[in-house]
Amino acid sequence: MRVADFSFDLPDELIARYPMPNRTASRLLTLDGNSGAVADKQFTDILEMVNPGDLMVFNNTRVIPARVFGQKQTGGKLEILVERMLDDKRILAHVRSSKSPKPGTIICLDGGYEMTMLARHDTLFELELNSESTILEVLEEVGHMPLPPYIDRPDEDADKERYQTVYNQNPGAVAAPTAGLHFDDALLAALKEKGVNVAFVTLHVGAGTFQPVRVDSILDHKMHSEWAEVPQDVVDSIKATKAAGNRVIAVGTTSVRSLESAAKASEGELQAYSNDTDIFIYPGYEFQVVDAMVTNFHLPESTLIMLISAFAGFDEVKNAYQHAIAQKYRFFSYGDAMFVTKKAI
């Protein structure tokens, strides 16, 4: 298949640049992968979509304030976007500057902190903090929330709360697992009260999630790598859920990719997973774990719309997106959501 097969025209006014006042106030489009049927709902109607005994799997990564501004000692301004924290002092980062820094270059950050450029790894720069503080402490003090480019506005104080799930736990993401933004504590409690089980995996979403696919054929695309963890207790819950004839429902494509990465690495019976993953899911992929998913609306020609198309069917997803555009759903990170069931192969 070609990348252009996943293109669609989206009116600019449908790109959500701010979240709804309340997390659960978004709309929810349901898509039955087998029939292709769609229905317009409110997000709180998700309680009707799930059954007692189902297992909902969330990504508990925490978004770090990964965008930092500074300048070289020579005076040239630059912008740093953290891709990954290597340890308490070192990061891999994208650096925007009129001239790329060379190894040994000292970078002066806002707040009076300094970093040294150690090495370049392809498009990424390895930087080391020259301070007794940790990278995380410095980012929390002077960093900005790394809003996606299409939101097209500076970050605001409110984004520190709203571009973050209520159940975030493990710092490391530079983009939010956006399907989870629709859940508040009351909705999570209502799900548990209904008898729905919940579990948490971790995938630290990288800045590569915003990079466009730059090849014509999807087979030529190389995915960026991200760190993911599926703990043993989650594996046990999945096995118990399947054995009871209930469904595993992934909240977000990052949860899907975490679970399917674990299945792929296990080569048989599902096992715990803690490693980098560059899994690329596109039509033709056979899902091993996930039966249904909650997801936002994704960019044209993105690897995420390819994943959804693999899950629910190419034509079914294309038709659902056209319906969403006609009904003026809000798109992308701060937009509305879908509840999608898997198409039988």
From Swiss-Prot:
EC id: 2.4.99.17
Subcellular location: Cytoplasm
Pfam families reported in the protein's UniProt record: Queuosine_synth
SUBUNIT field: Monomer.
Key word Transmembrane helix present: no
GO cellular component: cytoplasm
SUPFAM superfamilies listed in its UniProt record: QueA-like
Record's keyword annotation contains Transferase: yes
Organism: Shewanella loihica (strain ATCC BAA-1088 / PV-4)
Molecular functions per Gene Ontology: S-adenosylmethionine:tRNA ribosyltransferase-isomerase activity
Pathway terms, separated by semicolons: tRNA modification; tRNA-queuosine biosynthesis
Keyword terms, alphabetized: Cytoplasm, Queuosine biosynthesis, S-adenosyl-L-methionine, Transferase
Family under the similarity heading: Belongs to the QueA family.
HAMAP family noted in UniProt: QueA
Catalysed reaction, written as an equation: 7-aminomethyl-7-carbaguanosine(34) in tRNA + S-adenosyl-L-methionine = epoxyqueuosine(34) in tRNA + adenine + L-methionine + 2 H(+)
Any one biological process term the GO annotation gives: queuosine biosynthetic process
Disulfide bonds: none
Domain of life according to the entry: Bacteria
Function: Transfers and isomerizes the ribose moiety from AdoMet to the 7-aminomethyl group of 7-deazaguanine (preQ1-tRNA) to give epoxyqueuosine (oQ-tRNA).
Record-linked InterPro entries: QueA, QueA_dom1, QueA_dom2, QueA_sf
Protein name: S-adenosylmethionine:tRNA ribosyltransferase-isomerase
